[in-house]
Amino acid sequence: MHTGTTLTQFIIEEQRRTAGATGDFTSLLNDVVTACKAISNAVNKGALLGVMGALESENVQGETQKKLDVITNDIMIRSNEWAGHLAGMASEEMDDVYAIPGQYPLGKYLLVFDPLDGSSNVDVNISVGTIFSILKAPVAGRAAKAEDFLQAGTKQVCAGYAIYGSSTMLVLTFGHGTNGFTLDRDVGEFVLTHPAMKIPTETKEFAINASNMRFWEKPVQRYVDECLAGKTGPRGKDFNMRWVASMVAEVHRILTRGGIFMYPKDTKDPSKAGKLRLMYEANPMAFIVEQAGGAATTGYQRILDIAPEGLHQRVPVILGSKTEVDTVTGYHHEKAA
């Protein structure tokens, strides 16, 4: 039995500290948390419920959808469409904005989410997660349009992710620190277990898909070569390489023990500036990481400063321990000079 601060208590105390708070945001976040609990249960029981494996359909990204992609997307929608807090939703799994059904009132917030990040790993029992971001609607009470969502990451009211692994955790930021909560399944409540999470500025771990090395830009090749050179190289220390192929798992490791995660720009598909989606993955994770003392860039600019051009825009992502991110970003700027 837990004896610590529950997420419900934490959110209400946050509300009390916010001038003019009406409780709308608190209620919205509670609905998001409820969805994450339901998704955790679905992921945990996947094979028992017969929901593992792929479908014949593709999402807007051209990626083959897993059964759980569709199920978890539906859970997020059904949990959040009805309460009157939202003007609209956008999901990595849907082509366009999800309009709030006419029988429900419209609110003043926008919800953006990736319902099951890392879903390609779900069949092999590797940690996956849900990533979400909450924005203010430009016009409260009006059905949201696609352009309403195209706000820089600095405009996020809240960002978070749930990770479904050996335990289910929820990591949140409201813009003044990053906090982690662990689900106590006995009582069905998230409990504060990782207050004021901080990413070490120095690290000896880097995460990147090295099979794409031949497609990387020179600054990334240089950085990885220097890491691999170890103590006898220019960095003067040995590094370990990690790669889980689940952004939630990578970022969670970095938040708990440091490191740098890179999904850089490459020439594998010149039509794509990067692999990860700005709205659904890069912005919320950049917000979380920065609030934990880390840094997040594309190699050329701060991710949170990007002016979005589309709901499904892709960007390069380099995030984690500030010293390492600054080093890689510096190499990109040297190239551009």
From Swiss-Prot:
EC number(s) stated in the UniProt entry for this protein: 3.1.3.11
Main location: cytoplasm
UniProt keywords, alphabetically: Carbohydrate metabolism, Cytoplasm, Hydrolase, Magnesium, Metal-binding
Gene Ontology biological-process annotations: fructose 1,6-bisphosphate metabolic process; fructose 6-phosphate metabolic process; fructose metabolic process; gluconeogenesis; sucrose biosynthetic process
CC cofactor: Mg(2+)
Family: Belongs to the FBPase class 1 family.
Protein name: Fructose-1,6-bisphosphatase class 1
Organism of this sequence: Thiobacillus denitrificans (strain ATCC 25259 / T1)
